[in-house]
From Swiss-Prot:
One GO BP annotation of this record: rRNA 5'-end processing
SUPFAM superfamilies: Ribonuclease H-like (SSF53098)
Name of the protein: Putative pre-16S rRNA nuclease
Cellular component terms (Gene Ontology): cytosol
Organism: Chromohalobacter salexigens (strain ATCC BAA-138 / DSM 3043 / CIP 106854 / NCIMB 13768 / 1H11)
Family membership: Belongs to the YqgF nuclease family.
UniProt xrefs under NCBIfam families: RNAse_H_YqgF (TIGR00250)
EC class (word): hydrolase
């Protein structure tokens, strides 16, 4: 595993139809959106995730946690936690969950500014949301305090 501060990190924006993915390096604090992964009722193609992990060899996985605006858990946040637990169980990688409130709204704004026509059902913003989650994770002071 890479030293703290130099790790490669993959982030996931959990969804029932698509799972956004982004990759980033904590030293740079920046992230890049990757192609989203299809899901069926929140169940991903685990072979695609295995291939992604094989390709990128991340040191850490981050799963966005879609809390309600008042900070309470939602059905989706419970499902996202379960997804994170399964990632850890299947692949043995450390997993952090991170508050993603507002990431989808911000991703839609970024997409609109770039010319997106607003059909998010067919042309989602999942990768952008995962990128924003990861960049926010890198910028979070509490994350820096938790680094080994």
């Amino acid at each position: 595993m890479a030293e703290a501060g130099q790790r490669l990190v993959l982030a996931f924006d959990f969804g029932t139809r698509r799972i956004g993915v982004a990759v980033g390096n904590e030293m740079l604090g920046s992230a890049t959106a990757l192609a989203p992964l299809p899901a069926r009722d929140g169940i991903p193609d685990w072979q695609q995730i295995a291939a992604l992990l094989e390709e990128w060899q991340p040191d850490l996985l981050v799963v966005g946690l879609p809390l309600n605006m008042d900070g309470t858990e939602s059905d989706m946040s419970r499902r996202a936690r379960k997804f994170g637990n399964r990632l850890h169980g299947r692949f043995g990688k450390p997993v952090e969950v991170f508050d993603e409130r507002g990431s989808t709204r911000a991703a839609k704004r970024i997409a609109r500014d770039a010319g997106h026509r607003g059909n998010y059902r067919d042309d989602g913003v999942d990768g952008i949301a995962a990128q924003l989650i990861l960049e926010s994770f890198f910028a979070d002071d509490t994350f820096l305090q938790r680094m080994p």
